[in-house]
UniProtKB/Swiss-Prot annotation:
It is found in: Nucleus, Nucleolus; Chromosome. It comes from the Eukaryota. The lineage of its organism: Eukaryota, Metazoa, Chordata, Craniata, Vertebrata. There is a cross-link at residues 67, 74 (Glycyl lysine isopeptide (Lys-Gly) (interchain with G-Cter in SUMO2)). Keywords: Chromosome, Isopeptide bond, Nucleus, Ubl conjugation. This is Protein LLP homolog. Belongs to the learning-associated protein family. It comes from Homo sapiens (Human). Pfam families: LLPH.
Length: 129
């Protein structure tokens, strides 16, 4: 069964609401933990992941140099993609494209291929007017 536009929109809006209310939810959970003294923080760390903000500037020069070396080690893998068909060099569609759209494009591509083959057969047989 296909997903309706309404359900997609609702899901998107719920995700936005979660982002907006995340700080309030975190503070509420922390206050609950403060009330119950026998709960260990190790147990909480297994359940929820705590994100620590990263410093904007490197504090030591050694850390900056190490980061630069890691950036150089990255492999550049540019995926060559046909702009018209959206297929890459291996014949795969992009991840973000849904299955119905892939199926539709594949059928369209095969339809064009079939027409050109039929035309070639007619020309070969001498039936072209």
């Amino acid at each position: 069964m296909a997903k309706s536009l309404r359900s997609k929109w609702k899901r998107k809006m719920r995700a936005e609401k979660r982002k907006k209310n995340a700080p309030k939810e975190a503070s509420r959970l922390k206050s609950i933990l403060k009330l119950d003294g026998d709960v260990l923080m190790k147990d909480v760390q297994e359940i929820a992941t705590v994100v620590v903000p990263k410093p904007k500037h490197c504090q030591e020069k050694m850390q900056c140099e190490v980061k630069d070396e890691k950036d150089d080690m990255k492999m550049e893998t540019d995926i060559k993609r046909n702009k018209k068909t959206l297929l890459d060099q291996h014949g795969q569609y992009p991840i973000w494209m849904n299955q119905r759209q892939r199926k539709r494009l594949k059928a369209k591509r095969e339809k064009r291929k079939g027409k050109s083959k039929a035309k070639a057969v007619k020309v070969a047989k001498g039936l072209a007017w």
